[in-house]
Amino acid sequence: VYVSGQVPMVGGVLAETGAVGEGEGFVSPERAKELAAVCALNALAAVKSVVGDLDRVERVVKVVGFVASDPSFTGQPGVINGASELFGDVFGDAGRHARSAVGVVALPLGAPVEVEVIVHVRD
């Protein structure tokens, strides 16, 4: 199952907006990591809506994370760890995956983080 990019929506509302960076006026890397976990939860909800039961997930194949970043920010992998750690918590070894973490200028709706996922499911 290929899940399109998920942003940190909670109750239909974007949980936070802005670029990730250090200092005032930016989303902190710690907060962005939490938001990446929210993106991962939203991705799991999308998978469940298609396959009916998350027990059908054999493994998480790949995660691609995008982080709207201040030009001097280079901690994108640490931010996307929020998603990776959640998949590990939910699926154990089956949650281990290939991953990319990319810094970008902006994301849809002003989101600080976006996560897309590929999972392999049983028939």
Language model features with spans:
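Short, polar/acidic, helix-capping and beta-turn segments at strand->helix junctions
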Residues: 1-123
